[in-house]
From Swiss-Prot:
Record organism: Pseudomonas entomophila (strain L48)
Protein name per its UniProtKB record: ATP synthase gamma chain
NCBIfam families registered for this protein in UniProt: ATPsyn_F1gamma, PRK05621.1-1
Methyltransferase among keywords: no
Main location: membrane
Keywords attached to this entry: ATP synthesis, Cell inner membrane, Cell membrane, CF(1), Hydrogen ion transport, Ion transport, Membrane, Transport
Subunit: F-type ATPases have 2 components, CF(1) - the catalytic core - and CF(0) - the membrane proton channel. CF(1) has five subunits: alpha(3), beta(3), gamma(1), delta(1), epsilon(1). CF(0) has three main subunits: a, b and c.
Lipoprotein in keyword set: no
GO molecular function per UniProt: ATP binding; proton-transporting ATP synthase activity, rotational mechanism
UniProt xrefs under InterPro entries: ATP_synth_F1_ATPase_gsu, ATP_synth_F1_gsu, ATP_synth_F1_gsu_CS
Amino acid sequence: MAGAKEIRSKIASIKSTQKITSAMEKVAVSKMRKAQMRMAASRPYAERIRQVIGHLANANPEYRHPFMIERPVKRAGYIVVSSDRGLCGGLNTNLFKALVKDMNENREQGVEIDLCVIGSKGATFFRIFGGNVVAAISHLGEEPSINDLIGSVKVMLDAYLDGRIDRLSVVSNKFINTMTQKPTVEQLVPLVATPDQDLKHHWDYLYEPDAKELLDGLMVRYVESQVYQAVVENNAAEQAARMIAMKNATDNAGDLISELQLIYNKARQAAITQEISEIVGGAAAV
């Protein structure tokens, strides 16, 4: 029964792991719901501030903010939003694949790359595979604050205003639904006009201070809000991916336990049959 003992030990070990993955799945479900609430709460602000920017730009058409001016791209910047922890399936791997593809397309055109990395997994990736990381931040926790991001975002915005980079994009996972998380690369600056944006929002307001001064401040707030939205949405995507990964691990553990239990029963049955045969053989010899 030595084989049976080993199988019993494996079954006990897998059951212990199954309890852990099941608990992690339940925790991920709870965290995902909270992250979804934060995501839904911050989304209207990000959308509204863009509408205000569009109106301010129309209110002062002779002034073109640097964040709205297209220029030849010699150097591009990326703000990469990754997770701090693993055990979330292929979430980070898929994100890095999308990022590397976009970076390679730029490099083929002679464009150099600067990176701002949010999250430990992104920092580890670029430490291993290389990349010009000019700013990094990690361990934002389950409830990230926009104030935690301002410093890193400012590094990239200052680089854009100084002409050291000519385009800035944010790379993150979009939360589509519980089962789907989509890696995306979105351009932040220069600001890309949305179709019919100017036609939908015509407000007759007087601004104090003037529209130009407000626009200068709001453009920075807009970029910060977009990065914050990306972080919150990536967090929701991370928890959803972890929930699915832990559910799959729990289910696979159950299947493996069933298989091992069957093998154990067969081994035990074979041992009993052998013992009976030996007893019968001994009795016949007597």
